[in-house]
């Protein structure tokens, strides 16, 4: 029997607080990128909540999406609050904007008013009914799986939407029919600028890339200037790639799937491949989400086996296995103070203070 390696498991901390209030599984947690004390969460019944983790209470609740089969909140994304100010007819103090993705294919944008109230400022109906989470870039572009209501639609296709004009401006699918057929559904997506270190305001759409994890276990990088041939591609897993994360400079990353491997890799544009640098073997398969902390010293994974795993990103070594949740962990996120939040099928959100520097 394979025994999963980890360091200091016996001393792994408990969460310092549990946020209760959701009645259905918590599918997504997201920290505010301006105020680290604000946390957003979305659940399977379509409920969107705003929490103040310093005061340890929920300060706003909104029904964001329909509930039931095919309903609920699938993911939450942070947006800059520039473009949506044009919809602010009441001169409200907008503290930020978040995007919510429903399982029914509906995309909504919510302005946060006075750090305590949700205001729906945008609605977009797409054809996507897949289980893959969308990826937003600034407040202009959105990538989403193009497979959906029409069973004859192209299952491997990814659509790039202009959020402002509510139009599909690009469709990504390989020209090679054999590759197209074997990829299967896009399961995980990330839009990013070719050079993340540049000021985003100076970037053009021609410099945008999309990394996509597919149902057959392959990871591909696309250049939006030429969407017929991927820039980089490799088969990393034997199961669908459910989550991956890239470093700030997009030169390395981590991927997880339905199998029992967490894979760390470098991106080699010359060989057009992902070079595997480390494989972490797990006792139980299934990784829902991966997040790299802002300082890139550690990363965390959310597991189907109720566990949160912490790794040293630079040394590629396991640090701890966090145990609290009684059901699968679906989502995790770090705030700028390095607090970790985890959302689970058990309807609870756990807050963890781990590997942080005390002042």
UniProtKB/Swiss-Prot annotation:
Keywords: Repeat, WD repeat
Coiled-coil ranges (or none): none
WD repeats (start-end): 21-61, 68-120, 132-171, 192-232, 236-275, 282-321, 324-359
Gene3D superfamilies associated with the record: YVTN repeat-like/Quinoprotein amine dehydrogenase (2.130.10.10)
InterPro entries membership: G-protein_beta_WD-40_rep, WD40/YVTN_repeat-like_dom_sf, WD40_repeat_CS, WD40_repeat_dom_sf, WD40_rpt
Domain of life: Eukaryota
Alphabetized Pfam families for the sequence: WD40
SUPFAM superfamilies documented for this protein: WD40 repeat-like (SSF50978)
PANTHER family named among the record's database cross-references: GUANINE NUCLEOTIDE-BINDING PROTEIN SUBUNIT BETA-LIKE PROTEIN 1, TRANSDUCIN BETA-LIKE 3
Protein name (record): Guanine nucleotide-binding protein subunit beta-like protein 1 homolog
The organism of origin for this protein: Dictyostelium discoideum
